[in-house]
């Protein structure tokens, strides 16, 4: 092979390599363009799907807006697998058919349903209507009070455990004995003796839904509003069972009925009658317990206090000396006290004081120490606090300079 031929071959080879690298570069560029187009296509497909979803939603809303309104009724009872007796106000009661998407097992008495306007067919089950004021009565967070925070009420704690805590945690014991579970308990006694505190402790230990309502909240100015709130209160308690309904100041609606021409008194009596009806209506095995508290048991209606509605009445007397000492120990547990403080002597200085007043003595003693810029509480602070809270004559002899130093 001559030199000329070799040079021609090498020249052709280099030309071929140049073409190859050129086309490879072009192919890579086109692949990048194709990848970018695919990415744009996927993005456009996602946008299309999102727009289609919005279109479907708008069409459904438009269809709902174009539909005729439905009647709202309340189920009385199911008649058979395809028929239900429904009460519609004010028309009356109707036996209606079920829509194909409604299961007869989901249709229970007293539930709210929607009926078609033209055929009265039951086509939707509605949620129960609850007044916002009633829903606010349910305490979302379980109270942090415990039995250890209640001093001097060992007998009362034992009795309320038997009535409220034991049926919720161990209902089989009542079934074994063949006795009915207690429905409710009444806590009565002077103000500040620990009725509300013990109710909160029960809710903490039973881990139940705690519904707290004051009797004055059920007194409404419009006729029938208070009765409706009582009904919705028990409906909410059944939905969130096991639950405890704590009614404080029950004497505001549960006082003895008298003949009066006042419309306000009549409305309060209607509210109490609805409460009596609800106490008779719900079963004790439904894990709904009622705790009532009052400091005026003498004015309560006898119908409210009879067994079967209120099965146990627990008295909260003013604490004796030992009980006051226990309360002082509980509330001074976290206080920074000096050595040698005689809490028994402090308890002896408060004859007839309530538990709230004993707690107030601890708070006032801390305020006296704070007033003098001290980080500890002394015996003298407690004695001055007792004199102030109990309003004794010794308060007049205290040094003004000592008080306002």
Curated annotation (Swiss-Prot):
GO molecular function, one term: proteasome-activating activity
GO biological process: proteasome-mediated ubiquitin-dependent protein catabolic process
Superkingdom as given in the UniProt entry: Eukaryota
One Pfam family, short name: AAA
Main location: cytoplasm
PROSITE patterns xref list: AAA (PS00674)
Binding sites annotated in the UniProt record for ATP: 189-196
ATP-binding listed as a keyword: yes
InterPro entries: 26S_Proteasome_ATPase (IPR050221), AAA+_ATPase (IPR003593), AAA_lid_3 (IPR041569), ATPase_AAA_core (IPR003959), ATPase_AAA_CS (IPR003960), NA-bd_OB-fold (IPR012340), P-loop_NTPase (IPR027417), Prot_ATP_ID_OB_2nd (IPR032501)
Keywords: ATP-binding, Cytoplasm, Nucleotide-binding, Nucleus, Proteasome
Location(s), subcellular: Cytoplasm; Nucleus
GO cellular component, one term: nucleus
Function: The 26S proteasome is involved in the ATP-dependent degradation of ubiquitinated proteins. The regulatory (or ATPase) complex confers ATP dependency and substrate specificity to the 26S complex.
Record text on subunit structure and interactions: Component of the 19S proteasome regulatory particle complex. The 26S proteasome consists of a 20S proteasome core and two 19S regulatory subunits. Interacts with Rpn6. Interacts with imd and Usp2 isoform A.
Sequence similarity: Belongs to the AAA ATPase family.
Protein name: 26S proteasome regulatory subunit 8
Gene name, Swiss-Prot/TrEMBL: Rpt6
């Amino acid at each position: 092979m001559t030199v000329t031929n070799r040079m021609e071959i090498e020249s052709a080879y280099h030309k071929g390599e140049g073409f190859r690298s050129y086309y490879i570069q072009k192919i890579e560029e086109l692949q990048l363009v194709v990848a970018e187009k695919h990415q744009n296509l996927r993005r456009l497909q996602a946008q299309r799907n999102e727009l289609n979803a919005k279109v479907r939603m708008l069409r459904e809303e438009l269809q709902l807006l174009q539909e005729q309104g439905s009647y709202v009724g309340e189920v009385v009872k199911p008649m058979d697998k395809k028929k239900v007796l429904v009460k519609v106000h004010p028309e009356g009661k109707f036996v209606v058919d079920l829509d194909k998407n409604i299961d007869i097992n989901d249709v229970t008495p007293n539930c709210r349903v929607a009926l078609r306007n033209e055929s009265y067919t039951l086509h939707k089950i509605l949620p129960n209507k609850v007044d916002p004021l009633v829903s606010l009565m349910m305490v979302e967070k379980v109270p942090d009070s415990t039995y250890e925070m209640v001093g001097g009420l060992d007998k009362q704690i034992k009795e309320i455990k038997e009535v409220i805590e034991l049926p919720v945690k161990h209902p089989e014991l009542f079934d074994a004995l063949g006795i009915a579970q207690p429905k409710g308990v009444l806590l009565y006694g002077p103000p500040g003796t620990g009725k509300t505190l013990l109710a909160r402790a029960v809710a903490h230990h039973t881990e139940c839904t705690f519904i707290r309502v004051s009797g004055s909240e059920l007194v409404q100015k419009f006729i029938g509003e208070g009765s409706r709130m009582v009904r919705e209160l028990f409906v909410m308690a059944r939905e969130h069972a096991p639950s405890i309904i704590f009614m404080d100041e029950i004497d505001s609606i549960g006082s003895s009925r008298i003949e009066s021409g006042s419309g306000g008194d009549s409305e309060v009596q209607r509210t109490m009658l609805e409460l009596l009806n609800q106490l008779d209506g719900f079963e004790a095995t439904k894990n709904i317990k009622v705790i009532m508290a009052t400091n005026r048991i003498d004015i309560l209606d006898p119908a409210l206090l009879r067994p079967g509605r209120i099965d146990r009445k627990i008295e909260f007397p003013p604490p004796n000396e030992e009980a006051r000492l226990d309360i002082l120990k509980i509330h001074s547990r976290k206080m920074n006290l000096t050595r040698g403080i005689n809490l028994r002597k402090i308890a002896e200085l408060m004859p007839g004081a309530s538990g709230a007043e004993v707690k107030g003595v601890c708070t006032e003693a801390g305020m006296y120490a704070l007033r003098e810029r001290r980080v500890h509480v002394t015996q003298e602070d407690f004695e001055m606090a007792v004199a102030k809270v109990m309003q004794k004559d010794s308060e007049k002899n205290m040094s003004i300079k000592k008080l306002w130093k």
